[in-house]
């Protein structure tokens, strides 16, 4: 399995990189500058209406409330037109984000598989070492040296749970 990421049509395009929230805010401000302008106009109209109300100027207050309605309408139109204009770009961005998530999940899966392969290899190595040690022990058990004869007699006698004196007698009887 290759650890290279899946090739993408978005690679090399600086527009489609993971971005911070501040970068996203700046990008959205540059993409649709009319929406913040409409929000600012609405806020200014409300501020002026509030000041007129405090001053007691009802004519100016009514005029500013109408200006607020116009500014909100302008903002709403900017949102709708901007949404229609940037629809394809948003779809591309969603596709890019989906591919990024897919790549990350594939990398996690590959790392998990590598870890499983490493553990499996370690387990096989341990089993081979253990089998080799058992084979060496079995091989050593078949070749008994003369000085091991006494030991094997004692071991056999221990299996029968006889005493030391009986084991020595058995050993002497074998040599004669």
From Swiss-Prot:
It holds the Pfam family HIG_1_N. Disulfide bonds: none annotated. It is a multi-pass membrane protein. Residues 6-97 form the HIG1 domain. Residues 140-158 have a biased composition (Basic and acidic residues). Keywords: Membrane, Mitochondrion, Transmembrane, Transmembrane helix. It is found in: Mitochondrion membrane. GO terms for biological process: mitochondrial respirasome assembly. The chain crosses the membrane at residues 33-49, 69-86. Signal peptide: none annotated. Residues 129-158 are annotated as: Disordered. One of its GO terms (cellular component) is mitochondrial membrane. Cytochrome c oxidase subunit which plays a role in assembly of respiratory supercomplexes. Belongs to the RCF1 family. Associates with the respiratory chain complex III/complex IV supercomplex. This is Respiratory supercomplex factor 1, mitochondrial. The lineage of its organism: Eukaryota, Fungi, Dikarya, Ascomycota, Pezizomycotina.
